[in-house]
Amino acid sequence: MSLITITQNLGSGGMKIARQVAEGLNIDLYDDNRLQAEALKLNIRPDEFKILDEKAPGLFDRILGKKPDAYLDLMEAVVYQVSRHGQGVIIGHGSQMLLRDFGCALHVRIHASRSRRINNLINEQNLSRESAEKLIRKSDNERNGFFNFAFQRDLNDPSLYDLIINTEKIGDAAAAKFIIDLSASEEISSCSLTALDAMEKMSQTKKVEAVLLKNDINLTMLFVEAPEKGTVRINGMTATQDEKDRIFKAIQAMPEITDFQSNIRVASGGY
């Protein structure tokens, strides 16, 4: 099994390489559209996850205009959900950070100079040089800003990646073949059942947290965990009885949760 994350910048050629890798390994490609489709399986409405479309302009503004913590939890839930299969090519969405502790994932960064990226956009999208420069500048600012906001890390930090490919030196086909060959190594291809089970539990936990945040629940004094599929356990404290009641109501509205275990106390006089 091959689980690969690919991080790219607009115009770097990363999407082409990702498609070739997925086709060469005969595994699924999880781009924006596919991740949104997977979100539906978690009972996440399309309009909720569409806010995280990395290709659409205004990414950072869209997140800040909503409930940012809730949407970050949704993003994590979807990434963990698709990763539990142990194979696939995931494009962006912080997947290199979310899966950094899973040894079975190969994290790849596709790099190209700004001048090469500008020329690629001019040729591929028939843009003027000024338009291409503006589009790349805006895309870079939004992606870097979002990543820093979500993870407090620099998107360009080389320590986040197992492999960095410069597409000015290595063509798309050669890059794809190199990734395919590397993913076949024993260290990368062996993904334990324990790791896959952990991803599924983390996906369920993040989905529950996102639902609670959407319902204006303060998670500061709450601990959410998913010991097994369909089960959620919440321990901690709420400021009011109303907040505690809203937690129960929110969880009961989640059809995928069949066993809700709680030990929630109401603080006397608030926090």
Please tell me what each predicted stretch does.
Residues 38-87, 127:
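ATP-dependent small-molecule kinase phosphotransfer cores
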Residues 66, 94-96, 170:
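Short glycine-rich anion-binding loops that position phosphate/pyrophosphate groups of nucleotides
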Residues 88-124:
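ATP-dependent NMP and nucleoside kinases share a basic, alpha-helical "lid"
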Residues 28-40:
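Short beta-strand-centered segment that lines the nucleotide-binding/catalytic pocket of NTP-utilizing
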Residues 101, 112, 119-124, 146-160, ...:
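N-terminal targeting leaders
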Residues 5-19:
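Glycine-rich phosphate-binding P-loop
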